Structure formats: structure tokens, C-alpha cells
Amino acid sequence: MKFIIEREQLLKPLQQVSGPLGGRPTLPILGNLLLKVTENTLSLTGTDLEMEMMARVSLSQSHEIGATTVPARKFFDIWRGLPEGAEISVELDGDRLLVRSGRSRFSLSTLPASDFPNLDDWQSEVEFTLPQATLKRLIESTQFSMAHQDVRYYLNGMLFETENTELRTVATDGHRLAVCAMDIGQSLPGHSVIVPRKGVIELMRLLDGSGESLLQLQIGSNNLRAHVGDFIFTSKLVDGRFPDYRRVLPKNPTKTVIAGCDILKQAFSRAAILSNEKFRGVRINLTNGQLKITANNPEQEEAEEIVDVQYQGEEMEIGFNVSYLLDVLNTLKCEEVKLLLTDAVSSVQVENVASAAAAYVVMPMRL
């Protein structure tokens, strides 16, 4: 196996395929990248058995067909360390991989390509293309609500659901829920799968979200695959039942509050400074045309913020974890938000007034 290539052609692909590799691989070969030269193409693959990232790069200079695996971190560090514009030759010599460029020469250990684990073959059940920007928005709108190391393992991920012409993402950690749906202009079979947290983060790294560049998504019963430009990302799915988010959305909210997103965000941020550091609770009092936020902590310090809002109705008091509300307001980045409430013990639903694509539910707190 042999190829010659410019440093820049391989730098980004190396960075992306090294992404799935964890710090300390359980098997030595999982710390390696698979390098495979075929006719005019070099493919690079990294895997941690849960997900796999593959990049294809075209070879214009002389090359010899073959395959091997090489320590990912060291190979990438060498590549990154070589000067910009360098031409690099890579050659397999016995069980060593020789990397040469200018006056630099490296000899790396390898493991046989035949030992490299492949994700099992699988059939996709749903396939469609969509703009990268759409998928990026779907993930960005909901990923902050994913659970982290929850014993309910199915919450440590994101639900991807196809229905009619929409793709929907849902995430919840049991205290809050985020759901976002986008029309992708093609009729889809109803299907839902849970993509693990790490897979969602890797997929997000692949998306540049620029303009209308398209990607292809394939969803099977145990895997999800995304074809993005010269990259193919595959992730195993979480086997479990995701909670029915439709039951979490407040049924018939009786109170509607409309407020400026930025003004509300700043008021909550200031009040949060004097909230209990552990529980982060703030109290909200609603009266006609006004929303009052109060916070206090064990040191008996207090904060009070009053915000003008559009609200007509009976007075009401309710408590929330201020961090959860701020996460939602930071994600919405809109002009005006709508809060839908029922009573002091029911969840609040938060939406952008101008768009119903995303909805957020936050459970109340007893204060």
C-alpha cells in the first residue's frame, strides 16, 4: 500500500474520523484508523464499535492498492505537525507504516486491516435527503435537553421520528422536554429511533449547515447512517422505548404570556445570580401586564426582577429551575416568546411566537 497526498487534503478527514475514538480504547485496534487504498481513492475509517466514521479522499498521484491500520492519535498529530502545503508520502513496509515529507520521516506500528471491526451489514428502512441546515437546526433546537448518564438509558439520546412529510427530533431528561419538527418536502413512512448522545454530537460535528448542501439519511432498525459530502457516519441505535412526548405537552393551557425573549432572558440571568446554587429555583408571579421573578438563597440574599408582558388573567405563582428556562431562551434566539401555563403544579410550554416549529416543556418546582 502506498500513496502521496498534500497535507491539507487529509487534515480535515483525519480530524473527523478520529472523532468517534474515545480516550482509552478497550481493544488496541479501536485506537487505530483503517487506511484503505483502492483505485484513485483513499478511505479512512475510525470506530468505537458503537459508531463509525468513514471519509473518502481522491488520489491524483501514484498509489498502490492495499490496506492497514495505524494508531489514530499519532498519525493525526504527525499530519497536523507537518508544515502547511507539505507533500506527504505514506507507504506500508512490512508491519511498519512509513510517513515521509521533506526532511521528516516517521515509522509507525500497524495492525492488520483484517482485524479491523466492521459494523454488521444492515438494511435501511427509511431513506431520504434533506438540507444540512435543516438537520442542524433540528439537532441544535433539542440537544440541550438530552439526559446525561441517566439510568434510563433511552433518555441519553435523541428521538428521530418521521411522520408524513416531517422529520422530528425530541429530547428529554425527565425534567424538561424539547421537540422540533421540520417539513422536508417528501412523504415518509412513520418510523422512530433513538440515536445515542455521542452519536448526536458526532453527527453535529459533521454538519457545516451552510446553505442548501444536502445530506442523505438512512434509518434501519438498529442503525442510522448519514452521507454528508465525502463522509459516511454510522451509529448504532439505543434499544428502548422513548416516552410519549405528546402526553407531556400541556393539554389545555389556560394562561398565555407573551414577552420579549431577550428582556426575559436577561432578567432570569440576573435573578439566577442569587438563586440557590444547587437547586437553581426562581419564583414567578404573574399579574395583569407584569411578570415578577424572585430568587433567594441560603445566605438570605434576594433578587427581584419585574418585566412587562402581555398577560390578562388571574394572578398566579409558580416556581422553576432557572437554568432550564435559560437553556430554552438561549436556544430560541427569537424576538418574542409565548409561555403557556395552566396552574402552579403544571408544566409550562415555551414557544417562539413567530414559529411553531419547536416547543419546549419545563416541569415546575416546589419552592
UniProtKB/Swiss-Prot annotation:
Pfam family, one: DNA_pol3_beta_2
Keyword terms, alphabetized: Cytoplasm, DNA replication, DNA-binding, DNA-directed DNA polymerase, Nucleotidyltransferase, Transferase
Main location: cytoplasm
One BP term from GO: DNA strand elongation involved in DNA replication
GO cellular component terms given for this protein: cytoplasm; DNA polymerase III complex
Coiled coil: none
InterPro entries per the UniProt record, alphabetical: DNA_clamp_sf (IPR046938), DNA_polIII_beta (IPR001001), DNA_polIII_beta_C (IPR022635), DNA_polIII_beta_cen (IPR022637), DNA_polIII_beta_N (IPR022634)
Gene Ontology molecular function terms on file: 3'-5' exonuclease activity; DNA binding; DNA-directed DNA polymerase activity
DNA-binding as UniProt keyword: yes
Cellular compartment(s): Cytoplasm
Family: Belongs to the beta sliding clamp family.
Task performed by this protein: Confers DNA tethering and processivity to DNA polymerases and other proteins. Acts as a clamp, forming a ring around DNA (a reaction catalyzed by the clamp-loading complex) which diffuses in an ATP-independent manner freely and bidirectionally along dsDNA. Initially characterized for its ability to contact the catalytic subunit of DNA polymerase III (Pol III), a complex, multichain enzyme responsible for most of the replicative synthesis in bacteria; Pol III exhibits 3'-5' exonuclease proofreading activity.
Subunit annotation: Forms a ring-shaped head-to-tail homodimer around DNA which binds and tethers DNA polymerases and other proteins to the DNA. The DNA replisome complex has a single clamp-loading complex (3 tau and 1 each of delta, delta', psi and chi subunits) which binds 3 Pol III cores (1 core on the leading strand and 2 on the lagging strand) each with a beta sliding clamp dimer. Additional proteins in the replisome are other copies of gamma, psi and chi, Ssb, DNA helicase and RNA primase.
Family annotation (PANTHER family): BETA SLIDING CLAMP, DNA POLYMERASE III SUBUNIT BETA
Protein name: Beta sliding clamp
Lineage start: Bacteria, Pseudomonadati, Pseudomonadota, Gammaproteobacteria, Enterobacterales
